[in-house]
């Protein structure tokens, strides 16, 4: 049961967290480039 529950929770979580981190790092790079 845990094997079925874990991926069910991890997939959407990673699918939301990973793009959020990517967008955050991208926006930080853009801000640094604009300031410099």
Curated annotation (Swiss-Prot):
<keyword id="KW-0934">Plastid</keyword>
<feature type="transmembrane region" description="Helical">
    <location>
        <begin position="6"/>
        <end position="26"/>
    </location>
</feature>
<dbReference type="InterPro" id="IPR001302">
    <property type="entry name" value="PSI_PsaI"/>
</dbReference>
<comment type="similarity">
    <text>Belongs to the PsaI family.</text>
</comment>
<keyword id="KW-1133">Transmembrane helix</keyword>
<comment type="function">
    <text>May help in the organization of the PsaL subunit.</text>
</comment>
<keyword id="KW-0150">Chloroplast</keyword>
<dbReference type="GO" id="GO:0009522">
    <property type="term" value="C:photosystem I"/>
</dbReference>
<dbReference type="Pfam" id="PF00796">
    <property type="entry name" value="PSI_8"/>
</dbReference>
<protein>
    <recommendedName>
        <fullName>Photosystem I reaction center subunit VIII</fullName>
    </recommendedName>
</protein>
<keyword id="KW-0603">Photosystem I</keyword>
<keyword id="KW-0472">Membrane</keyword>
<dbReference type="GO" id="GO:0009535">
    <property type="term" value="C:chloroplast thylakoid membrane"/>
</dbReference>
<keyword id="KW-0793">Thylakoid</keyword>
<keyword id="KW-0602">Photosynthesis</keyword>
<dbReference type="InterPro" id="IPR036357">
    <property type="entry name" value="PSI_PsaI_sf"/>
</dbReference>
<dbReference type="GO" id="GO:0015979">
    <property type="term" value="P:photosynthesis"/>
</dbReference>
<keyword id="KW-0812">Transmembrane</keyword>
